[in-house]
Amino acid sequence: MFLVCFGTRPELIKLYPIIEEFKNKKIPFKTLFTGQHKDLITQFINLSGRPSFTLTDIMKHNQSLNSLLSKMLIKSDPILKKNNFKIIVQGDALSSFAMALSAFNNKRDVIHLEAGLRTNDMFSPFPEEANRIMISHLSNIHFCPTKRSMENLSKEGIKNNTYLVGNTIVDSFSLITNKFKI
C-alpha cells in the first residue's frame, strides 16, 4: 500500500493528480499530512477528503529546522513501524525529507516525485537544495520532471529506477480546472 505524504501547498498541488489516479484506478493508498502548513488541511479535505494520518502539534513559532524535523520524525515513526507502506514524497520541502528519512529508518521504500532537480549551490535555496540531494539518496524510485534532472541523478551515481515523467503541476492544473469548472 502507498502512503502519499505532504505538508506544504506545493506538495499538495503536485501530489493531487497521484491521489486522484489512485482513487480512479482503485489502487490502495493512504495520505499523511505532516502539519507543516496547517491551513492546508481544509483545502485538502475539500479536494480529496480527510487525510488518513495527521501529525499534530508540529509547528511552533520561531522553531528551528532541527526542531521541526525531529517532531516530524518522532510523530511519523509509529505510523511507519506499524504499516508496510511505500512512501511517496514530492519535491524538496522539509516535510518530504522528514518522511523520506523516516521511511528509510523503517526500511520502507521511498518514491520521490520531482526527483533530480538541482541548483548546484547547497545554500540556494536553503535548506531545499540539501533536502533534494538527501531525498534522492534515500529513495528507491525517482520520478524526474526533465531530462536534466535525470542527468543530475546519474552524475550522483543514481542510475537505476529513474523515470522521466514530466511535472504533475500540468496534470494538477487540468484536474482542478475541470473539477471546479474554472
Residue positions per predicted region:
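Conserved nucleotide-sugar phosphate-binding/catalytic loop shared by glycosyltransferases and other
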Residues: I27-K71, K75
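Short, hinge-like loop/turn segments at secondary-structure boundaries
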Residues: N46-R50, N105-N106, P127-N131, N160-T162, ...
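Short glycine/proline-enriched coil/turn segments at helix->beta-strand junctions
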Residues: N24-P28, R50, K81-N84, K159-N160
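Residues at the starts of beta-strands that form the adenosine-phosphate
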Residues: M1, P28-K30, D109, I141, ...
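Generic domain-boundary/flexible-linker signal
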Residues: L40-T42, A98, D121, F173
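A nucleotide-sugar donor-handling region in carbohydrate enzymes
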Residues: T34, K38-D39, L138-I182
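Active-site and donor-binding regions of nucleotide-sugar-utilizing enzymes
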Residues: V4-F6, E11-E21, M59-G157
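Structural beta-sheet core signal
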Residues: V4, T31-F33, H112, L164
